[in-house]
Structure formats: C-alpha cells, structure tokens
A protein has these predicted regions:
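Aromatic (Trp/Tyr/Phe) and Gly/Pro-enriched flexible surface segments
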Residues: 27-164, 196-248, 259-322
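Short, small-residue-biased leader/transition segments that mark boundaries at the very start
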Residues: 2-9
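Extended, low-complexity, turn-rich repeat/linker tracts enriched in Gly/Pro/Ser/Thr and Asp/Glu
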Residues: 175-182, 193-198, 305
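A short beta-strand element within beta-rich, extracytoplasmic domains
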Residues: 165-175
C-alpha cells in the first residue's frame, strides 16, 4: 500500500445507528445511537485471583442482554459500538477487575451510571498498585486483558467509522459532584498528587477525517466538535439536553476552549494492520467536509487518565444524534 488513503473499517453507519429514526420537530430528524437507550446490558462474571480474595465481580458492558461467566477477554457483542472503562486486568498472573460503569434502574428501563473511584491491588512482594479510575463509556472498544497501568490507553480503540454530519448531540443526564475543590492523580507508579482545579464530568464529541500512510501511521483533520463540561450537581434528570456540533476551524468561536476542544495527539486506534497507533490531529478540516470517524465519550472526570475526584458521578441515557 502506498501513498495516503482514508481509513476504512468493516462497520457500516447503518450498523452503528438504530435503523428507524425518531422524528421530533418538523425540520428535525433524531437518530438513536445503537444501544444508546441503555436498556440492554451484558453482565460479565469475572473471578478474581485467590491471592487477592477470589471474589466474583460483575462487569457491565453495553450490548445485547446476556450473561457471561468466566475470565474471558471481552469483545464488543451484537454490533454494539460501545466500550466502557470496565476491564479485566491480568498483572503478573493476578486477575483483577475495575468496575466504574454500572447499570442503574430508571423508570421502566435502565441507564448508565459512571463513577470515579480508587482501585487498588496489593500482594506482598508481587504487586502494589493503586490508581484513580473514572467511569467512562465511549464509541470504540478495549483490548483485554490489561497488563498494567503504563500505556494502558494503547488498549483502547478510539472512535468508530462514520460519514454523516449531525447538527447536534442529544441525551438525558444527571450529575453529582464530589464537592472537592481540587483533583488527585493516582497512576499506580507514584505517590498521590494534587491537580489544581475542580473535577468535572464531561462529554466529548469529535468528527474526524482520518488518513493512513504506507507505514500504518494515522493522521486526522478535525471536522466537527462538541464538548460539554458539568461542574455542578444537576436538579435531578435533565431530559433531551441538546448540544450543537461546530464544524471546521472553531478556534475563533466564543465557546472555544483549547484545553478541552483543541487538536489532540493522545488517543489511540487500530490501523489497517491491526496495530495500536496514535491518532495525530494535524489541523482543522474545511467546514463542509465529511468525516470518516466519530468519537463520543461520556466520563465522570476530566483532565486525563488517573486524574479526578472520587465520588464524581454522571448518569447517561437515551443518546441520539440530531439532523
């Protein structure tokens, strides 16, 4: 393969989105993201190693209703485009889980509860790791098992193929803040540190036009952007919250925030060779360009891996795109 080509993966837009759109106002078309109603969940029963207690933990994944018993690496099922921060790790032969996304009851169905907490595993003479883990759901998948906290983000496949141009993202949410004025950093390899500034729950939506070169490196131009931070408790559920997607170069837009909306070089994807590579955003696309991929993440904390405030909680339900 020579030159530069647009990335292509065998997932169609039709498989990603629910087939029948919902119609709202006269000039508005609303399309649910597949499994975005959060009413179907896969429950994994993972048995942790005896040396750390031998407990059976339940890990929740978004997909067709099913139970899986056993320490099997998870792969997205039933055409689900959703990954979660719930993972099975195997470090120096010890099986340990992290569970920071939960299935919560809501009315006659379910929603997703994302929670920031501290996870630790300690075995004398073998392993001593304590990390801060945010609750996160996202479009993409995770390669299991995780074998350590160093470069664990390489296990994540960030985003899904997508070629449309929605005008907004819509979902229901509820927020509960930790009440802490600053965040903490716990990476598993160093002492607990303090990070200035209040923790926030966050929604990130990016549309990218990706290219892959002959060596498998992936670059991207940013086509569309929507980022929303939540720094206060909500008054119960906020239904049908709708946020506009901004197209093209948005650096002069009044709502632009470089920290959260700027071009990035920290997300990973799998190239056509199946290798995990960094996505390097190299510029802003023209405002009328079509994307090749969509990134959507909901997280109970912001600021990067292993940073946040324990207790921060974000509930999410009924995720849709508006055209």
């Amino acid at each position: 393969m020579t030159g530069v080509q647009t990335c292509a993966l065998p997932i169609s837009v039709i498989a990603l989105l629910a087939i029948a759109p919902l119609y709202g106002f006269a000039q508005e078309k609303v399309v649910p993201i597949k499994y975005g109603d959060m009413d179907q969940w896969i429950i994994r029963k993972v048995h942790e190693s005896g040396v750390i207690g031998g407990n059976t933990k339940l890990l929740y994944e978004i997909g067709p209703t099913k139970e899986i018993d056993g320490n099997k690496p998870y792969k997205n099922m039933g055409g689900s485009p959703w990954g979660t921060s719930n993972v099975m790790a195997k470090v120096v032969g010890i099986v340990k889980t992290n569970n920071s996304v939960y299935r919560d009851k809501r009315d006659n169905g379910y929603c997703a509860r994302l929670e920031t907490h501290i996870e630790s595993v300690k075995v004398l003479g073998m392993v001593n790791i304590t990390v801060l883990a945010a609750g996160s759901i996202y479009l993409g998948d995770m390669l299991e098992p995780i074998t350590g906290t160093k470069n664990a983000e390489k296990n994540m496949n960030w985003g899904v193929p997508f070629t449309q141009r929605p005008k907004a993202v819509r979902y229901d949410y509820k927020v509960k803040m930790s009440g802490e004025k600053d965040r903490i950093r716990l990476t598993g390899f160093s002492k607990k540190g303090q990070v200035a500034g209040q923790d926030c729950a966050i929604t990130v939506f990016f549309l990218q036009k990706r290219m892959e070169d002959a060596e498998g490196n992936i670059t991207a131009k940013r086509v569309g952007t929507m980022v929303m931070k939540y720094d206060k408790d909500s008054d119960g559920w906020v239904n049908g919250a709708t946020y506009e997607v901004l197209y093209g170069d948005i650096t002069k837009h009044p709502s632009y925030n470089h920290e959260t909306m700027g071009l990035r070089e920290r997300d990973y994807t799998r190239n056509s060779k199946g290798e995990s590579v960094l996505i390097k955003e190299i510029g802003w696309a023209e405002a009328n360009e079509n994307p090749t991929h969509m990134i959507l993440q909901f997280s109970s904390s912001h600021g990067g891996a292993f940073i946040g405030s324990p207790g921060n909680t974000l509930w999410v339900d009924n995720v849709k795109l508006v055209y």
